[in-house]
A protein has these predicted regions:
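Short, solvent-exposed aromatic-acidic interface loops
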Residues: 169-179
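Conserved alpha-helix/loop element of class I SAM-dependent methyltransferases that forms part
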Residues: 10-20, 25-52
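Glycine-rich beta-alpha junction loops
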Residues: 1-2, 148-150, 173-174
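Short clusters of hydrophobic/aromatic residues that line enzyme substrate/ligand-binding pockets
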Residues: 6, 16, 21-23, 110, ...
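N-terminal auxiliary segments of SAM/dcSAM-dependent transferases
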Residues: 1-11
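Conserved nucleotide-cofactor-binding alpha/beta core module
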Residues: 39-166
Length: 183
């Protein structure tokens, strides 16, 4: 995916470096290796395309564009109107009919599209919102950053089965904070 199309032209020469870059409104586009790691975790143990995926935190739209090649359908929700509009503009070039951009509070997910085979978040909070777990299909997987007891963030994988959920805490990461509401 052409990452330079998702950052400001002044930063285009840094688009392929393994670094996060500002995208406006105090938000960033994640490092390419972090995006790759999260998608790898989302797909681990699964073959073929993922079914319906919910992405929380559209940002500039880059990860939604990558997800469009891995999933049958992508619902991506952004709480900041300015970024929602920027993502819409960025994605227009690619004409991805399986990507649905939503403006709203990602902490409540998007119940109309549920259940999801996978949920991925680009912002981290103190806990995984219950709405996400409820909207995750049985057999589904959720990958998100979450604050640990030490106050740091770590990637968390949640697998949902008929018996319940299993949470695995992985490596340290640094994401923008997960916030409720819209702006």
């Amino acid at each position: 995916m052409e990452r330079h199309r998702f950052v400001d032209t002044a930063l285009a020469n840094q688009a392929y470096e393994d670094t996060s870059l500002p995208i406006g409104l105090g938000q960033t586009i994640s490092k390419p290796n972090v995006v790759a790691r999260m998608l790898e975790l989302l797909r681990e143990g699964r073959s073929g395309r993922l079914g319906r995926v919910l992405e929380v935190g559209t940002g500039c739209g880059y990860q939604a564009a990558v997800l469009s090649h891995l999933a049958v359908e992508v619902y991506s929700i952004e709480r900041l109107r300015g970024l929602h509009e920027k993502a819409r503009e960025n994605l227009r070039y690619f004409r991805l009919p399986n990507v649905h951009l939503l403006f709203g509070d990602g902490m409540v997910g998007y119940a109309k599209g549920a259940p999801y085979a996978a949920i991925i978040a680009a912002a981290g909070g103190e806990a995984i919102p219950q709405a996400w777990i409820e909207q995750l299909a049985v057999g589904g997987r959720l990958v998100a950053p979450m604050q640990t007891a030490k106050g740091q963030q770590a990637l968390v994988v949640i697998d949902k089965s008929a018996q319940g959920v299993r949470q695995t805490v992985l490596e340290a990461v640094h994401f923008v904070p997960l916030k409720s509401g819209t702006d």
